[in-house]
């Protein structure tokens, strides 16, 4: 996570505005009716998503986690009413708590296929019945994953994911898909990028899970 610690401030300057995704975050919020709901923000970065969620639902009790110390420091400064800690998103079952919402906005591109599927499984274990899971990733053939070079020369391995195996993993864990969206834009070097957003509800009735992608 040295790359993210190094570029934390630059990342905040570039990505603090989450306007492109606000409509999907609104769907997430709309499906959490309980007041003071416990929300987990995985790979929270500088707290950009947490900040938006709290602007819509100041009652949310949000815990944000990130592996980068500098990201966590920025997130806490940006969201003094939320809680943040340095933690690996692949270890969320260690929290030993139930959440009514889990936000995974910018994590999956840094997880392998196997890790992404495991994260969905882990999320199912710590979500309450009726809890909401938000997933977002860059969508493409998984085989196209590889090392990407940032404008400052830093290199990072980026994973593309496919909707098919993510949705299959969600259904296996008792999730019902309630919203699927795709957003297209141009990446930093001009290449076309498709962001996939999936919102699902933890639903333990297997007869009620046959929702098309």
Give short role names for the model-derived ranges.
Residues 1-33, 141:
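Conserved class I S-adenosyl-L-methionine
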Residues 40-42, 46-91:
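Class I SAM-dependent methyltransferase SAM/SAH-binding core
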Residues 103-104:
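A conserved beta-strand element that flanks and buttresses the S-adenosyl-L-methionine
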Residues 117-129:
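A short glycine-rich, Lys/Arg-flanked "PGG" loop and its adjoining helix->strand segment in the class I
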Residues 130-137:
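Conserved beta-strand signature within the Rossmann-like core of class I S-adenosyl-L-methionine
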Residues 138-157:
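Short, glycine-/aromatic-enriched active-site segment of Class I SAM-dependent methyltransferases
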Residues 158-173:
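Short alpha-helix
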Residues 186-213:
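Core SAM-dependent methyltransferase catalytic element
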